[in-house]
């Protein structure tokens, strides 16, 4: 970066000047300035801030203000090139070292670091295992260490990386170099674990609000998941970029093919694809408009695509942390976005079964995480309030999630629950048998299936006693009893057994109220966040909307020519402001949020030309 002349009496450039000149913003978000000034002064920090909340500036600005190079530890090898490209577009001297580089490129980056010609250097955590790397870093001047995605140090987290456990040693080797650890996802317990494992107990801590008000949360019963997803995309997100998460590789391939066959541009992404294919699909998703990525959780961490309009889950995430982080990839630009999930009985059975693996401590942790996820799915209260409470924060009903917009009915399910639990009990006591949910429902409905006849279950006194409910309603009952811990899943085949908590219900000592699943319907287009469309130009005046489209077309051509994602040139939010205010001079353009000095020099005249050519 070109030197910044300080406006103060000190020789150190001021953070606010860097914010305006380099990044093009006039003011900091809540908490940013305090943390930045603390790190600039040489202090350690631990930052918990939601995706899209401005975490990166908390280390990027101190790295530009302090003498030396900011060393950023990041697990996101596949994204380092894009991160560096985005910084270079701002005039920041950035580089990376990882296993994907050619030898010559690595030599150039190393020489730049040793010559003091880098503001930021990105490294994967595994490189710091090497004494050779540590000695190399010692030969240059380090401004700070930034530990990105710091939740990876948590052994109980959903993204645990063993190499992160070694990062506490950085302070031992460089005791005078400040450290800043950052994550978008951490409960109070995980927060404490990060601080303890990285030796940051005495650091300055910033816990920003976890609420993402532009995201609308919607969870519906899983019935025909492919069709439900297709309805969502066609009625609410036609032509939008989005991510669809599935639990297995085979599901990813099937859903991607299904969407393609229905005219929706979709790409698969999972660990079973070769590295070149994964890289190509990721690059297309970042650079092209309107693509849908169908993926396992192997995809998404660090994806800085601001205009992802929806994140859909076709399988239940294993934890609320995972769900929050995955849904947080939508709407990074602050515009309306949707977090949608189809959730059903088989999800609960499958994850309950997985939670029986491992040692006792691991099993207990997995069950606790799953219980919290199930509570979020089955709540009759505001989903946003429930989500924030999980992270130790208060909230009030948002009026914007599915449970606020259409409050679910509850019903007295005591008798049906007793019938189901009694069926499980009788099979176990009288026949020494255990079965899965489907067979139990067949017994209750009085279906003489081949399996029912084979085991003579038509002779049970409970055979046919549950005809007052449909099969779908019985599946909802089983799902909720599993979520409440009144039933448990056992063994390879997912058979159901009673728990100690089921006894009071069986004896009639505990009444049971369950959530009634809503009748499937088309999503309400008027119920988008803020009551407006998710389309970036939806609320612009006609002339501004036309200009916005022209600016996006110019941006797409420019990004293609430069070989970078479109958002590296400008975010939609910046183009919206340009279209709305219609600046006529470079001076006026420089006042737009997101137009820093380097981008003004690089793109200013071209933008003014687009504005002048507006018919």
Residue ranges and their predicted role:
Residues 2-22, 26-30, 34-46, 50-56, ...:
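Helicase motor core with emphasis on the C-terminal RecA-like subdomain
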Residues 310-315, 377, 416, 476-477:
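Eukaryotic partner-binding/assembly regions in large regulatory complexes
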Residues 362-391:
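Short, charged low-complexity linear segments at domain edges
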